[in-house]
Amino acid sequence: MNILLAFKAEPDAGMLAEKEWQAAAQGKSGPDISLLRSLLGADEQAAAALLLAQRKNGTPMSLTALSMGDERALHWLRYLMALGFEEAVLLETAADLRFAPEFVARHIAEWQHQNPLDLIITGCQSSEGQNGQTPFLLAEMLGWPCFTQVERFTLDALFITLEQRTEHGLRCCRVRLPAVIAVRQCGEVALPVPGMRQRMAAGKAEIIRKTVAAEMPAMQCLQLARAEQRRGATLIDGQTVAEKAQKLWQDYLRQRMQP
C-alpha cells in the first residue's frame, strides 16, 4: 500500500515579539519569518504517528513524505525518514503559499499522476493561512472521496476504517481506497523520536527535489490588522491605598469568603 503524507513546514510564529506583529500591521506582507525555526504541524504529527504505529503492528505500507516550499522543510523530511519513511519529496517554490490552496493541490495531484498512490493524508489546516481547502481541492482534482476531521484510522488491505469528528459526534466509516483524508490532532498520539543512528542515516539519504514555477495566487493579501488581546478589568477608585483595599474587600472579596 503506497501512502503519501503531505505536510507544510510552518514557521514558529510564537517566537515573534509583540513589536514585530505591530510593525507587520503597517504593511501587507506579514511579519518577517525568514529567521524563525520551522515546525511540523500538530495534525501532520498525529497522522505520521498513526501510520508508524500501524506499521509497527504489522500493517504493510510504503510511506512517502512530501512538502512544498523552501529548504526549511528539509529538516522535517529527514526527520520523517529517520522514523521510517522510505521516500521524501520537496517541491521547491518561492511562491507565497498562504492563500494558494489550488496551487498546492494541483502540484500534489501531478505527483500522484506520476507516482500512483493508494492514500493521501494531509492535516486539516495549517497555522499559517488556515484556509483548510487543500484536501478538498486535491480530492476533486483526483476524483477521490475526501474525509476531513479524521481523528483515527485503521488500514486494512484495500480499505480504510476511519473515525471522523462531526458536529453531531463521532462517525465511523469504512472506505474503499483510493482516498484523501485530512487528520485532526486530538491529543492522544505523539510522534516518536528517532535515535541518533537513524538520524545519521537519514542525513545521508537522498531527498527528491523538484522545482515548481511560482505563480501569482488568485487571492492576495490587501491589508493586515493586529487583533487586540485584552482581558476584562475593573478599576477600583480611591484616594488612598487603604480606601482601595476596603472597596476591594467589601465589593469583591467579602461575599466569596463567606461559607
Curated annotation (Swiss-Prot):
GO molecular function: electron transfer activity
Alphabetized SMART domains for the sequence: ETF
Keywords: Electron transport, FAD, Flavoprotein, Transport
Pfam families reported for this sequence: ETF
Gene3D superfamilies on file: HUPs
UniProt KW Membrane keyword: no
Domain of life where this protein originates: Bacteria
Gene deletion effect: Cells undergo an apoptotic-like death upon DNA damage characterized by membrane depolarization.
Membership in a protein family: Belongs to the ETF beta-subunit/FixA family.
Function, in words: May play a role in a redox process.
Subunit structure: YgcQ and YgcR form a heterodimer.
Protein's UniProt name: Putative electron transfer flavoprotein subunit YgcR
Organism: Escherichia coli (strain K12)
